[in-house]
Structure formats: C-alpha cells, structure tokens
UniProtKB/Swiss-Prot annotation:
Primary location class: cytoplasm
Native species: Schizosaccharomyces pombe (strain 972 / ATCC 24843)
Name of this protein: Reduced meiotic recombination protein C1442.04c
Cysteine pairs bridged by disulfides in the record: none
Compartmental location: Cytoplasm; Nucleus
C-alpha cells in the first residue's frame, strides 16, 4: 500500500479490560488517482488550475478558481464549501450529465486515520476502502442545451470525488445528500477494523510466580496446576489497581486461610527489579500495578517468568503500641509497690499507737509489789523497764504534791470557819501565816479576802499544777517510746522471746 508508514506496536493498550497491541500510523492525505479518460477531459486551462489547487490542498479552493468555475447553477459540496454556478440558459439535461459523469468515474483510493482517546490510551483505526463506482445525484434545476458544453464536467466530477475525512471515519455520522455512496461501513470494534496490528492478551502475566512464606498452604493454585486461581484475569483492568489494592487481594486470601493476623503486615518484593514495599507504605496507594509491569517489560525478558515474593513482619503501629503498653504497666507496678510500702508504714504506726494505749499485764508478787509481764507483741524488756521507772517517778511526785496540799489545807482550815470567817476562838494566839509573817487581827475578813481567796484555799491551784506536771511527764515518756520504735523500725526485726545481744 503506497504511502502507509510502518506500524509501531504498543503493548499496554486495553479495550474493555483486554490488553491489545495497537498500530500507530501518521495521518495520510487524501489522494485522487485519475484514469486516462479523466486526463483526456482536462482541456480547459481554468479547470487545470482548479485541479492543481485541489491536489495541493483538498481542503481549500481559492476565490479566483471559484469565480472561474461558475458556469451553471448546480451546487456541489466540496469539503463543506459551496460553489454556485449560474448558467446563461436553463436547460434540463440531467440525463446527459449523469452519462458523462459515469464515463468519467475512476477508481478512488482513500486512506484515513482517526485517533480516538479512550480510557487514557490511543486506539488507531486504519481504514482501506476501494469503490468501484461513484453515483452522484445532481441537485438543482434544469440546464440549457446551449450552455451544456460550457459546463466543466471535470470540475463537477472533482467536486463530488473530494470526501470529508470525518464523514468516512465516523460511522455514526450521517452523510449528506451530496456525499459519496457505497462507502464500506467501519466497525466500532478495533479487532475487526485493524488488519495489520496483532492483538495480545498478555499471556505472559500467567507466568508470574507469587511466592509466599508457606507456598504449600497459601498458593493461589488448586490441585491441577493447569487450572489455577490467579490474582488477575485478562478481563481485569490493571490500570485502575494500585499496589494497595494488590495488597488487599493478597491479605483477603491469606486471612481466609487463617494465615495472617491484623498485627502483621505484608512485605512485597520484586526480585527482578530489587524493589520492596510494605503494606503500610504511603506510596502503595499512588503506584499502580501496571507501572510495575511496564518496568518489568523493559528490564526483563517476557519469555522468562517473573516473581513476586511476599513475606510478613510486625506492623510498626502494633509494635509501638505494645511497647507503650509495657512501659505503662511497669510504671503502674512501681506505683503499686510504693503504695504497698506506705500501707505497711501506716499499719506499723497504728500498731504502735495501739501498744501505747494498752495497759501492761501485771502480776502482784508475794511482798505486794506489782510485776509487769510481757507478751510476745509487747515492748522489749529495756522499753518496759524504762516505762516502769518513769511510772514510779511519776507516782512519787504525785504523792509528795498531795501531802503538801493536805498539810496546807489543814493549816488553813484551822484558822478559818467553813464560811470563810476567822476563827474567834483562836484570836488569843499569835496569828502566823504560811510564810511565818504576823497577821493583824484587827483586819477584817474583807481585807483577808482582798489578798486573795485562792491563797486561803490553795487546794485548787495545787491540783492544777500537779495535773500539769503529770501531763508533761507522760508526754515526755511517750516521745521517748515513739523515738525508740522509729529507730528500731529501720533495723531487721528480732524475736522478742530471745535475749538481745545488748
């Protein structure tokens, strides 16, 4: 075929999910092959100029050629351009024009190229049509016999032979009344319209080997290797599937076999390309599987099989959460240990308070003395002895204070009546106060009261003072016991039934 360039194959073009190999050709100009009969009719110089304009640019005619071609009132469609011819005389010779046009009919070879864009891929349709006859219907009114010889039949024929490219390529478009008839229809299916470009269904994809950690259990093949289950079939659209979708298919298969849990992620490796990508990689949703296959076609031989190796590893987020939980649990255990220690200390203090409040067990000896006995949970012998010594000292102090108070009270009562008045029976005696001073008996009882009623009745003051002394002694004793217990709390406990080393 003249003027047809060699076809360039592209293996990644699909139609309805099928992979095909397309032919790529540059656009060709419309060529008109004139036969000898047509050449003999080129006798008019003006017509030759029109023919040269058509051969140079079939889409454009100059205005001068149009003016020179106006010889009849017939209207012809030449590449969507109207040329009106106004004859001098109107004679109806339609049959004569039809006969002359039939004699001048020639064989026309039309080669067209239409590029269609479908789903991001180019589809090439190469059309080769041959017509044996061209039947044109003349439009218009009558022509005159005298002016029929002046009508350039060559121009009329050329005007009907030029066909719009869009009308030939697009099968769905309707040809107008002036279009060429008997044009072979063009199919929408590129397999039917493409003769030179061979189709390929990418059978080499079935040569891909998917290797899993345990291929015997999770292989994608049944008992018969010839009839296996594949991740993708020829009808699947690989252009729309990303690596993330590929991971999803593999995960669904492995989870159905109970071979993969949510704490593990898949790791996909292409050994032929030295590429690895994990399931949680952000680029997995941006790279399409067909991109990897295109790289394989360049770097690998299609006659050899390629492999995809899958493995598993702990997910980053799962392992991270596990470590955080371990650190949190260890911190909680340390807090629990501190709380347990504080609880033990509080229990020790409560026990000490209970021991301080308890009265020691006592036994009366034969001589009437009181002996304090110790239980297993009581204080040590040293502490008990010290406490007993403090108790004896306190009792002796209390006795002395009570004796002094009784003597003072007896002296006071001897000098005063019950109502506080001086005893008149003793006025002859020399009044002596507690301090040894002389008393003026002429002083009234009111003067005595002014000196202080408390000095006359000092028993209340002595009672208060003795109570203060007893309280101070008791407080000091408790402080000594508490300090001894705190000092012994930090040392290992010893059996209280065994004598100490001290």
């Amino acid at each position: 075929m003249a003027g047809v360039s060699p076809v360039v194959n592209h293996p990644y073009t699909t139609n309805s999910g099928d992979f095909i190999e397309l032919g790529m050709e540059p656009a060709q100009k419309v060529q008109v092959d004139l036969d000898e009969a047509f050449n003999q009719m080129l006798h008019d110089g003006k017509v030759e100029e029109v023919v040269e304009a058509i051969n140079g640019s079939p889409d454009l005619l100059s205005e001068s050629d149009v003016e020179n071609a106006k010889n009849n009132e017939h209207t012809y469609d030449i590449d969507n351009k109207n040329f009106n011819f106004e004859p001098k005389n109107s004679v109806n010779k339609t049959e004569t024009i039809r006969e002359e046009l039939d004699q001048a009919a020639s064989k026309i070879l039309i080669e067209t190229l239409d590029l269609h864009q479908k789903e991001g891929f180019e589809e090439t349709i190469v059309t080769e049509e041959a017509t044996d006859a061209v039947d044109l219907e003349a439009k218009g009114t009558t022509h005159g016999e005298n002016d029929l010889d002046e009508v350039p039949t060559e121009l009329n024929e050329l005007a009907n032979e030029v066909v719009d490219v869009d009308d030939v390529v697009s099968p769905s478009s309707e040809l107008n009344a002036q279009s060429v008839n008997n044009i072979l229809p063009i199919s929408d299916d590129p397999k039917d319209s493409t003769s030179e470009a061979e189709t390929r269904d990418f059978n080499w994809l079935s040569k891909g080997i998917v290797i899993f950690p345990n291929s015997s259990e999770c292989a994608f093949y049944g008992n018969n290797n010839d009839e296996g289950m594949y991740l993708y079939s020829n009808g699947d659209d690989l252009n729309e599937n990303t690596i993330e979708d590929f991971f999803g298919l593999v995960r669904a298969r492995l989870e159905s076999l109970n071979l993969l849990d949510s704490d593990s992620e898949l790791l996909c490796e292409f050994p032929d390309l030295s590429l690895k990508i994990n399931e949680d990689n952000v680029y997995a949703s941006q790279i399409h599987l067909v991109d990897i296959l295109e790289i394989l076609t360049v770097h690998c031989d299609l006659e050899e099989s390629f492999s995809i190796v899958f493995s598993t590893q702990p997910r980053f987020i799962a392992r991270y959460n596990e470590l955080v939980q371990a650190v949190s649990s260890s911190s909680n255990s340390e807090i629990d240990e501190v709380e347990d220690a504080e609880t033990i200390d509080s229990k020790i203090l409560e026990k000490r308070n209970d021991l301080n409040n308890e009265e020691p067990n006592s036994v009366v000896a034969e001589d009437g003395s009181e002996i304090i006995t110790l239980d297993e949970n009581d204080q040590s012998p040293n502490e008990a002895t010290e406490k007993l010594r403090d108790n004896d000292l306190e009792e002796s102090l209390i006795k002395d204070e009570n004796l002094e108070d009784v003597e003072d009270e007896n002296v006071k009562l001897d000098n005063y009546n019950i109502d506080g008045s001086l005893n008149n029976a003793d006025l002859s005696q020399e009044p002596i106060t507690n301090d040894g001073e002389n008393v003026d008996w002429e002083a009234t009882s009111e003067d005595v009261l002014e000196r202080g009623y408390e000095s006359a009745f000092p028993e209340s003051e002595g009672t208060i003072n003795s109570s203060k002394r007893r309280l101070s002694v008791t407080t000091d004793t408790e402080n000594i016991e508490l300090s001894d217990e705190l000092a012994s709390a930090g040392t290992p406990k010893k059996s209280k039934l065994m004598p100490s080393d001290d």
